[in-house]
Amino acid sequence: MAAKEVKFGDSARKKMLVGVNVLADAVKATLGPKGRNVILEKSFGAPTITKDGVSVAKEIELEDRFENMGAQLVKDVASRANDDAGDGTTTATVLAQSIVNEGLKAVAAGMNPMDLKRGIDKATIAVVAELKKLSAPCTDTKAIAQVGTISANSDNSIGDIIAEAMEKVGKEGVITVEEGSGLENELSVVEGMQFDRGYLSPYFVNKPDTMVAELEGALILLVDKKISNIREMLPVLEAVAKAGRPLLIVAEDVEGEALATLVVNNMRGIVKVAAVKAPGFGDRRKAMLQDIAVLTGGTVISEEIGLSLESTTLEHLGSAKRVTLSKENTIIVDGAGNDGDIQARIAQIRAQVAETSSDYDREKLQERLAKLSGGVAVIKVGAGSEVEMKEKKARVEDALHATRAAVEEGVVPGGGVALIRALNAIINLKGDNADQDVGIAVLRRAVEAPLRQIAANSGDEPSVVVNEVKNGKGNFGYNAATGEYGDMIEMGILDPTKVTRSALQAASSIGGLILTTEAAVADAPKKDGAAGGGMPDMGGMGGMGGMM
């Protein structure tokens, strides 16, 4: 086992503090509408330029192991805020830096670190409760656009396109972000249920100009097995032909004579039909077939529940207003499923999302949710260069997380104002002893830090701005973009309550842990002499040629 180096008490905390400050100083430069860029070197390719706090934090590793511990702990603050609310990473870092710096001064002055932490925790609970009181619901498109704009570093086009996407697919709908091919951001919306399986034969195509098969008022047969024998399908095909409606077959696979017969029937116009493989694999395929069944009001024909193809009737078939099949995708629009059944299915999938611990499973479940709840919106990010594309895409993703958080828990006035107003909750708060009171004072100072940093990044005097905002009431705050004071909500400067809350909770949690650290253990640096022990002998090997 490698030798370890151990530092205790003040010397351990001082080293960690250096790391905390190095990382926080790099990250906090990006805060606010006039935040600066940070340039990140890459081991290959062009450097990346970003104003995204968590991207900066992730890149930082320090040479000194003890300093690096402090930096990594603050990086964890940014990651926690990002995981919980998807944004607020820079605010969380600024709060953590203030808590650690002010707290360590108190520890050096002889305060009990455990009581300091208790005071900080007590004050955090009070501030979070006050933030919830200040929170206003975020339901209208304008407010959603404003939240997106602020999170995307005051880029109106991003806020507007996210609000438009939410309007089209609903608050629960899935919105994905992709790299576009143009200079402008684009929004495309796929209505209905889309899955990534195309027609099994090009002979099903009935729109040769666009190479798609379109079925109007289609009946839908869902089968949880391979179909290779046409005989077992004859009863249902005859019933569909009598009904005079087109048929979509979704099965594990359709092959051999079954596929050939379907193609011939389609080309002769006996039955207008198209076949497609069921999406997904294994258990996920069964679940997605069931989703389609609920959406279209049909039943999955499966031997597991005692249904066979031979006994299938029109009652077992689902239906939809329109089905469009291309080479790669199938879209089912306006399924005839019962609304109550669809909502029950959505609730069931939501419960599974809450229970799963796998990110992959969660993503797949959310995709299924979107398909059931009415569509998928794709934001294609436009940019002039690859470097700009990466930076812009990260901002769009941040803004999307922020708007989701706003819809979930509401909004508070932005620009650090909500935390200043929440100070009211801890002005007269008392701890159980004098040291806890100091912990409360540490947090009182920390909640001013985001506003101070926004003002500093804008080239203004932080103390003047903080005093001016403190003297105001309600939504009164400082618009750093224009240098004006006024009502933050009216000026469209909003922060999601969840983002502000998560930032504060993550910062006070990690800040408290650093303050109560009494020993730090790291790998001891390797001595240079140890690695070079065998080198002198190598010189002797060069003479071997002369010996021969």
Curated annotation (Swiss-Prot):
GO cellular component: cytoplasm
PROSITE patterns for this protein: CHAPERONINS_CPN60
Family stated for the protein in its record: Belongs to the chaperonin (HSP60) family.
Role description: Together with its co-chaperonin GroES, plays an essential role in assisting protein folding. The GroEL-GroES system forms a nano-cage that allows encapsulation of the non-native substrate proteins and provides a physical environment optimized to promote and accelerate protein folding.
Identification of the protein by name: Chaperonin GroEL
GO molecular function, one term: ATP binding
Lineage start: Bacteria, Pseudomonadati, Pseudomonadota, Gammaproteobacteria, Pseudomonadales
Source species of the chain: Pseudomonas fluorescens (strain Pf0-1)
Chief subcellular location: cytoplasm
Binding site for ATP: 30-33, 51, 87-91, 415, 479-481, 495
